[in-house]
Amino acid sequence: MDIENDLLCFFNFRSPYAYIGIKKTIDLGLKPVFLPFCYVPKEILEAVTLNNPYKKDYLLEDCKRLFDEEKINLVDEIPADCNWPKVHAAWHIINENNLDLGLTFMLKAFESRFQKGLNIGNKDTIITICNDIGFDSELAINAMEDVEIDNYLKSLTKIMRELKVFGVPTLVYKRERFWGQDRIPYLKSLI
């Protein structure tokens, strides 16, 4: 990964905005280096208002509009949070073995969460996705407990701080940040 020249895409399986952003990125033919945003720098966590019910209601309304625009069915109730680093660890081992399968797993994980309402932190869901894409599910499940992979995911907070990434999807090209799925067409015009 070359943070000076590669197109980087920070994502998290928790975010419906990341799902829409990644879909738009792929639809426009962009090929970013995907980086999980599953360990969030402390200073960002302290600044986030997690419990604002009005904001949560608005975000769900907004996501529904965006999903409708993309002709994607959004479940009525998005599953509760899970241990996000573990899910991203499963993705990481698949992506490290095969970039195409990593992308396929990513899209199926988003689909499972936002279209089917499944808990993607559940190992049975991970196993099903792996079986669907032809990847050894045992490797993915073992990755969820792998200390080295977890340390790698934690190390990404250094890059997030350096590039001032604060949410997903964030795409970074030549150190210029593009936050949000609506910035992707403009980014495409620059590349």
List PLM regions with ranges.
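Structural alpha/beta surface segment adjacent to cysteine/selenocysteine redox centers
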Residues: 17-113
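C-terminal cap of thioredoxin/glutaredoxin-like
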Residues: 2-30, 108-191
